Swiss-Prot record:
It comes from Lactiplantibacillus plantarum (strain ATCC BAA-793 / NCIMB 8826 / WCFS1). One of its GO terms (cellular component) is cytosol. Belongs to the TRAFAC class TrmE-Era-EngA-EngB-Septin-like GTPase superfamily. EngB GTPase family. The lineage of its organism: Bacteria, Bacillati, Bacillota, Bacilli, Lactobacillales. GO terms for biological process: division septum assembly. This is Probable GTP-binding protein EngB. Keywords: Cell cycle, Cell division, GTP-binding, Magnesium, Metal-binding, Nucleotide-binding, Septation. GTP binds at residues 30-37, 57-61, 75-78, 142-145, 174-176. Mg(2+) binds at S37, T59. The keyword Cytoplasm does not apply.
Length: 197
């Protein structure tokens, strides 16, 4: 998709604040600092539209980015960051669960994992949770440029094995630095929004 118009239209914490346009939505989920903002910036051809932060846990709301008056990217608060209080984490968890399980315009979820490491317990829990709700899923392994080519197959196998990855879901290696995977991610998004369901 050629992207010219992007707008952060809403930072929401409750369903009453969600956009009401009816455009299809793609949720972007992953632990703090996995690269969600960088993925959004690459997809929309901007350097710093979605705020990237060196402080994990910075995103505390559901941020709705309207893309080309056709769909929304919904940046979900990063999970699994220890310095946030337990009460805060529970509040985020409830907000995320409400959105991911009851939003009728949600067409799929992109779960981001760090390609350099095995998925965390939080990553595994998010993947299993979305599978339980039968949500179309794309796992994006970020920072893939950090993995030497000769070791990539082994690393991909480790990620998939840890997640208990299912064949009907999709998996894409992505690098914000080299733009590897950008077109493939867009194809998946379009298939589940403007070009599909």
């Amino acid at each position: 998709m050629e992207v010219h118009n992007v707008e952060l239209v809403m930072s929401a914490v409750a369903p009453s604040q969600y956009p009401t346009t009816g455009f299809p939505e793609i949720g972007l989920a992953g632990r703090s600092n996995v690269g969600k903002s960088s993925l959004i910036n690459v997809l929309i051809n901007r350097n710093s539209y979605a705020r990237t932060s060196s402080q994990p846990g910075k995103t505390q709301t559901l941020n709705f980015y309207k893309v080309e008056d056709q769909l929304y990217f919904v940046d979900v608060p990063g999970y699994g960051y220890a310095k946030v209080s337990k009460k805060e984490r529970e509040k985020w968890g409830q907000m995320i669960e409400t959105y991911l399980t009851s939003r009728e315009t949600l067409r799929g979820v992109v779960i981001l994992v760090d390609a350099r490491h095995a998925p965390t317990k939080d990553d595994v829990a998010m993947y299993e949770w979305m599978r339980y709700y039968e949500m179309p899923l794309l796992v994006v392994a970020t920072k893939s440029d950090k993995i030497p080519r000769g070791k990539w197959n082994k690393q991909e196998s480790l990620i998939k094995k840890t997640l208990n990855f299912q064949a009907e879901d999709d998996f894409i290696a992505f690098s914000a630095k080299t733009k590897e995977g950008k077109d493939a991610v867009w194809q998946w998004i379009e298939a589940h929004t403007v070009g599909g369901n």
